[in-house]
A protein has these predicted regions:
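Divalent-cation
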Residues: 1-129
Length: 129
């Protein structure tokens, strides 16, 4: 299946679910289709902080800690892939490469994968269906 590169277009408070946010992902280009993904408040905050480069939290957020750990272990995130939707739940994988060149694939919630992707500036893809 074809992987389509997408970007984070924004975050919006979800009127339907208390404490939930919609992460708005979109294709690149003029006729960009949008993909809303419902995420939790903590994940929305983490993504917002990472997108707004001028904000520096006084202590590392969870995704900052993950990034720091991967950096110390010599592992680089190469891409994020949102690849499945089952019963209203999206599934994602984080593709990384360790210092020995081995590819690693981690199962992830899309919100966590995107929070890491925006921190390390790696591409985000969705499978065409």
């Amino acid at each position: 299946m074809q992987e389509i590169e997408i970007t984070v277009k924004g975050l919006s408070y979800s009127q339907g679910k208390s404490g939930a946010y919609a992460l708005i992902l979109a294709e690149k280009g003029p006729d960009a289709r949008k993909l809303p993904v419902v995420i939790g408040g903590a994940e929305a905050q983490s993504i917002a902080v990472a997108l707004e480069k001028s904000i520096a939290p006084p202590r590392p957020m969870t995704h900052d800690t993950w990034q720091n750990m991967l950096d110390e272990l010599g592992t680089q995130i190469e891409k994020v892939l949102i690849h499945r939707l089952v019963n209203g739940v999206f599934y994602a994988s984080i593709y990384a490469r360790n210092e020995h060149g081995a590819q690693l694939i981690f199962d992830s919630r899309p919100s966590d994968a995107v929070a890491l992707a925006v921190r390390v500036d790696c591409p985000i893809y969705v499978l065409a269906s």
